[in-house]
UniProtKB/Swiss-Prot annotation:
Coiled-coil intervals: 101-128, 164-203, 230-257, 393-432, 526-578
InterPro entries found in the cross-reference section: CFAP_domain-containing (IPR051147), DUF4200 (IPR025252)
Keyword Coiled coil: yes
Family membership: Belongs to the CFAP100 family.
Name of this protein: Cilia- and flagella-associated protein 100
GO process terms (BP): cilium movement; inner dynein arm assembly
Native source species: Homo sapiens
GO cellular-component term (any): axonemal doublet microtubule
Length: 611
């Protein structure tokens, strides 16, 4: 019996060896074939990325995973576009579908594993029980004699195989326990996921309900807000309209107040004094009545806080007086009546501007009666009842203003004339005084100089002309000099009357005027001098042109006279042969100087005055 298991074990070992050898051969052949295939793949698809040490593997390449996820999302989106409405799913349904599909896959895998394990167990059991097959296999084989070392080796191999089987069984048991634990954990996770999905669905439903309620509440609030905004707009438009009416009424009140002040100013003083007396009488009567009322109120017993009631009544009375007038004013303006008799109690009277003042009421101050009547609420009385009265007053004022304007214009004209004449006379007198002063100084200086020169000349004459004095020749020369100096003096001063001055005095005056002219010429700006020079040059050119034209006319007349004389002269008949042009000798032209030399007026004046 011991031989049979040993033979069986040896056979099993040989079978295992054969199977291992076949596996090694197949693996070696596959390894030999694999490099060829890899070389072909490398030739077809390029170098292997695993050869690069900096290359990420396929399961760690984030960029590749991102591209895959993006492509997957795009494909799902395209698929969703092509799908119908009833085929599409929400996110929660997708998640639940994924969970269910995973669960089904796991269940199918578990079933397949169970079936495979059962099939393997049945196969092993049938193989162990099939002893006849084992006997038939081992019956006809030659059993070789075994040694102790071979036996030990076989036992050792059996032990190793048994140990390997035990290790594998323990590992299988451990993996089974881990699988059961993992299944339990997956079941718990599945249950928790189902609970979470249910809670999430409930939360989504509650959120939808709350969002619907919030939308309804928001719609109600928006409707109420829009209604309130419309009401506010209507009220603001009404307020703006009322404010515009109030401002318009205030403007009209201001205008009417100005008109009233103007009418009060135009009214006579007697009427104003009478109105003031009447108003003072009414005021005194009112004060007496108020004092009697206060005494009666203070004397009545049983009233608590009479002072407070009196104050409240006075306050209510003031408010009634303040609010009564604008309300009455608005009513009158709406009815179309002209509220010319009303005025604002809070606004001051504005001054009215008038062209001229009336002697009766224009200069008189505004009486206090108008303010009091306004405060009392009574209609103010006016002196003017018809517009014709105002027109008459305006006509009188206009006549007075016209007469005053004429008088003022005449007085202004006379004042201007008097001031002008006074100024001119003052300037002329100042100029004459200065001139006389200068003349006095020059005369005194010239007298001293002349006395010195006379003394010197007398001394020289006595020295050089001792015994050779000719009085007649000296007198004639002095008379000619005196005539020339007088002519120059008249041209310089512009006086045609005969002066009773001596030659020396006339020469000093001429010299003084020449100095003044030179000084004035220095003070005159260069532009004016240039303008005067241009004007002089222009006059000179015009004069030269005129003289040239006259000379041309004279020459033309002479030419005409010569032509006329030539025409009237007898015709001379030519005799002999006419000279040819080539044999005609050249005519000798003699240059004749023109006798008509033109001299400029300025040169004549220079020659006359300075030679």
């Amino acid at each position: 019996m011991s031989e049979i298991p040993s033979t069986i074990v040896s056979k099993n070992m040989t079978n295992d060896k054969n199977s291992l050898e076949s596996m090694n051969i197949s693996s070696s052949s596959s390894t030999e074939e694999n490099p060829k295939k890899q070389a072909r793949k490398n030739e077809e698809h390029g170098p292997d990325p695993s050869a690069n040490p900096f290359h990420l593997s396929g399961d760690v390449d984030f960029f590749l995973l991102r591209d895959q996820e993006r492509n997957k999302a795009l494909s799902e989106r395209q698929q969703q576009k092509t799908m119908r409405v009833h085929q599409k799913m929400t996110y929660s349904s997708k998640v639940s579908a994924k969970h269910t599909s995973l669960r089904r896959q796991l269940q199918l895998e578990d079933k397949q594993e169970d079936l495979e394990a059962r099939a393997e167990a049945e196969h092993q059991r049938a193989f162990r029980d099939y002893t006849t097959w084992k006997l038939t296999l081992t019956k006809e084989k030659n059993v070789e004699p075994e040694n102790m070392s071979g036996y030990i080796k076989q036992k050792r191999q059996m032990f190793l195989l048994q140990y390997a089987l035990d290790v594998k069984r323990r590992e299988i048991q451990r993996l089974e326990t881990l699988a059961t634990k993992e299944e339990a954990r997956l079941e718990r996770a599945e249950k928790s996921l189902e609970k979470d999905a249910a809670l999430f669905d409930e939360f989504v439903r509650e959120n939808d309900c709350s969002s619907v309620q919030a939308m309804r509440a928001a719609e109600k609030e928006t409707k109420a807000k829009i209604e309130k905004i419309l009401e506010i707009r209507d009220l603001t438009t009404q307020i703006v309209n009322i404010k515009s009416e109030i401002s318009r009424f205030e403007d009209t009140l201001k205008h009417y107040k100005v008109y009233k002040d103007f009418l009060y100013k135009l009214s006579p003083k007697e009427w104003l004094e009478e109105q003031e007396k009447k108003h003072s009488f009414l005021k005194k009567a009112k004060e007496v009545s108020e004092a009697s009322k206060e005494s009666s109120v203070n004397s009545t017993p049983g009233d608590k806080g009479p002072g407070i009631k009196g104050k409240a009544s006075s306050m209510w009375a003031k408010e009634g007086q303040g609010t009564k007038k604008p309300w009455r004013f608005l009513q009158t303006m709406r009815l179309g009546r002209s509220p010319s008799y009303l005025s604002s109690p809070q606004q001051g009277s504005q001054p009215s501007e008038s062209s001229g003042g009336d002697s009766r009421g224009s200069n008189s101050p505004i009486p206090p009666t108008q303010e009091d009547t306004d405060s009392d609420g009574e209609e103010p009385q006016l002196y003017f009842t018809e517009p014709q009265q105002l027109l008459d007053v305006f006509r009188e004022l206009e006549e007075q203003n016209l007469s005053l304007i004429q008088n003022s214009q005449e007085t202004e004209k006379t004042l201007e004339e008097l001031s002008h004449t006074l100024k001119h006379t003052q300037i002329r007198m100042d100029r004459e005084v200065n001139q006389l002063k200068q003349w006095v100084t020059t005369m005194m200086m010239s007298i001293t100089k002349e006395e010195d020169t006379a003394a010197e000349l007398e001394l020289k004459a006595r020295v050089f002309h001792f015994g050779e004095y000719k009085g007649d020749q000296q007198d004639k020369l002095l008379e000619s000099l005196n005539c020339k100096v007088l002519d120059v003096y008249r041209h310089c001063t512009g006086t045609q009357q005969e002066a009773n001055l001596g030659t020396v005095q006339m020469l000093t005056i001429i010299e003084h005027q020449l100095d003044e002219l030179l000084e004035n010429l220095e003070h005159v700006p260069q532009v004016k001098i240039e303008q005067a020079e241009r004007a002089k040059e222009k006059e000179r050119r015009i004069r030269l042109r005129e003289e040239k034209l006259q000379m041309q006319k004279i020459l033309q007349e002479e030419h005409l006279q010569r032509a006329r004389a030539r025409a009237q002269a007898e015709i001379k008949k030519k005799r002999g042969r006419t000279l040819v042009c080539r044999s005609r000798p050249p005519a000798h032209r003699i240059k004749q100087q023109s006798e008509h030399t033109l001299m400029d007026k300025e040169e004549e004046e220079l020659l006359f005055f300075f030679t």
